[in-house]
Amino acid sequence: MGDTQQPTVLDRFAPHALDTSEAERLSREYHKNGPYNHVVIRPLINDTLLRNVRKELMENIHFTEKVTDIYRVWQTGDLANLDGLDKKEQNMLKYLRQVRDALYSEEFRSHVQKITGCGPLSASKKDLSVNVYSKGCHLMNHDDVIGTRCISYILYLVEPDEGWKPEYGGALRLFPTLQPSFPAADFCHSIPPQWNQLSFFRVKPGHSFHDVEEVYVDKPRMAISGWFHYPQPGEPGYDANYCDNTVSTLQSLTMKQMDLELPRFSYYPVVKPEPLSKQDTDILSNYINPLYLTPDGIEKLSKRFFQDSVIVLVEFLNQEFANTLLKRIIDAERQPTPMHSSEVSFPWKTAIPPHKHRYLYLDHEEFGPDIILPMDLQRLPAFQRWIQLVSGLPLRSFHQVGRRFRPGSDFTLATTNDTALLEATLCLSPGTGIANTDNGAYDIYMIGDEDPDVDAAVYRGDQQDDSILLSLPAAWNVFSLVYRDEGVLQFVKYVSRQAESSRWDIYSQWNPVAE
C-alpha cells in the first residue's frame, strides 16, 4: 500500500496563491494603490475549505449584536483561543481553525511581508474574529491604530454562488487625509465584498482611515477580520519601544489637526438672568408654545429640571411657527440631498473630520429669512433669560449649530466633556418614521467607562446595559435641556439609509457661571 501524502499548509490556499510571482505582482499593486498602500487577493483560500468554514459558522457559532457610537455589527468573541476549546467544540470548528492557522502560518506571513515590506510579523499573537453585517449594520471611520497592530485584513465569506453586488453596500471604503490624522470628508476608494477575497493594508498612524458602508439588503456580509501584529516579546524583531513611539506619533499628529476641524465653535456672551418682562414674553410667543412661557409653566419646568437634570418639551414651538418650519424642511427634503462634500453649497457646510463627526451644519452667524432652521431664536436676550429661569443656572456664554444628519451618511461619535455643561437641542425632524431607533438618528447620553480596554460607548450587547442615562429619538418639534456632568459621553447615532428623512436640529452648549 502506497504512502498517503499528508496535506500541507499550502493545500489550504487557492492554487498558486502564494507563488513568488504572485507576491511580486501583488507588491507592485500594493505600493501603487492609494489613498494608502493596500491590496486585494482573490481567491486566497482553498474553495472547498472556505465553504466548510462558512457552513461551520452558520451552524455552530453564536453571534451577538453589538451597537456602539461607531458600529452596529453581529460579532463572535476573539477566535485566537480556539485551541482552548474542548474537543467537541474544536471538532465543530475544525475548518475555521485550519484557516486561522493558515493565515498566521510562516508561509503566509512571509507572503505578506514580501508584498508589503513590513518586516517581521508575530507568529504568537493571533488577533481575529468573525463579524456579520446584516441589513443596517455599519462601521464608522477609524484608523485601526491600537497597540502593536501592523497589518489589517478582512477575508470575506459572503454567499459563494450568488455573488455580492456593489449596490448591496458593505464595501470597505478608504479615505485620503487632508493632513496626517485628519481624514477628508469623503472616501476615494471602495472595495465591495466578494467571496474568498482578502483585502489588507498597513496600519499607519494618522493615515489608514477607513469605514464599512452600511449593508442595504437582507443578506449577511460575513467576514473574518483581524490583524497581524509586530513581533511580541521573545520573538525575532521585537521592539520594546514600538507602542510608546506610536502614542507619541499620534499625539503629535493630533495636535496639528485642530485648525482644520469644522465646525469651529465661537462662544457668545449671555445676558444676565432676570425675570421675563411682558416684552420678553411677547417676543418669545412668536416662536414658543405659550404653555412654556407662563410664570406657572416656567416654575413647573424649573422644578422638574432641578429634580431630574433633564426636561423634554414636546410641541415646543407654537403651531403657526412650527407649521411654517415644517413646510420649509419638507421642501428641502424633496430636493436632491447633497451627499459628497463638493455638492454642499452655502449656507451649509460639512462637519469634519469624519473619524469624529459628519453632518451638514449652519453656524452661529447664519440666520435670516432664507435660512431653513430658526438660528435666531437662541440669540434672543429673551430666550437667554428664559433658559436661565428654566434651568435655574446663571449662564455666561453659549454656542449653537444648526445640523442636518443625512440618511446613509451622518453621525457624531462619542465625546466627553471636561466640565459640566448645559446642552439644549431643538429637534425638528419631520415624519414619524425617523423616530424608529432601528434607523439610528437618536441622541444618547452615557456613563463613560474608566477602563481603557473597554469600548466605552457599547450600549447594546450581551446584557442589558444600565450605563445609558438618556436616549432621545429624533422627533418633530421637541426641545430637550440636559445638564451634562463632567465625563458623560454623548453622541448622535449614525442615520441609516432606511430612515425616511434627515435628522434636523439646533444644538447648543451653555456654560454655567463658575461658582
From Swiss-Prot:
Residues binding Fe cation: H142, D144, H210
Full protein name: Prolyl 3,4-dihydroxylase ofd1
Function in brief: Prolyl 3,4-dihydroxylase that catalyzes 3,4-dihydroxylation of 'Pro-62' of small ribosomal subunit uS12 (rps23 and rps2302), thereby regulating protein translation termination efficiency. Negative regulator of the stability of the N-terminal transcription factor domain (Sre1N) of sre1 which is released from the membrane and enters the nucleus to activate hypoxic gene expression.
Subunit structure: Monomer and homodimer. Interacts with nro1.
Annotated cofactor note: Binds 1 Fe(2+) ion per subunit.
Record note on what altering H210A does: Reduces nro1-binding and leads to constitutive activity for sre1N degradation
Reaction catalysis annotation: [ribosomal protein uS12]-L-proline + 2-oxoglutarate + O2 = [ribosomal protein uS12]-(3S)-3-hydroxy-L-proline + succinate + CO2; [ribosomal protein uS12]-(3S)-3-hydroxy-L-proline + 2-oxoglutarate + O2 = [ribosomal protein uS12]-(3S)-3,4-dihydroxy-L-proline + succinate + CO2
Keyword Nucleus in annotation: yes
Species, as recorded: Schizosaccharomyces pombe (strain 972 / ATCC 24843)
Family: Belongs to the TPA1 family.
